[in-house]
Amino acid sequence: VTQQTAEWNAEKAQQIVQAVIDSGETFNVIYAENDNMAKGAVAALDKANISHGVGKDVIVIGFDCNTWALEELLAGNWNYDGQCNPFQAAYIDDIIKNGVTTKVVIMDEKGFDATTITADDVANYGI
């Protein structure tokens, strides 16, 4: 397992993944905390002719549910993309500290798998 920070940046992610590829270390999963980092990681895989996505050599996981990223899922180039809203943190903190019980949903958290995503999902949930 190799873990490095790409600082939310596609170019930095590409450099990191390229360095891992160049090291000869084997891997089969890219887990990126945002879609841009996943995009950069995939660029390094593509440059090295390493297959990725459904049924391929490397599983690709991103977060943010950008429309373009969901389209990568739909095409089978990525395996999973999720939406996790950081704005919920203040609400959760308030519940813990003050016992607030009213439900506030800022954004539904979603997750999409490449084997089940539909064009409607891309249209309805892509940002």
Segments from the language model and where they lie:
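A residue-level marker of the well-folded mature domains of exported/periplasmic proteins
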Residues: 1-127
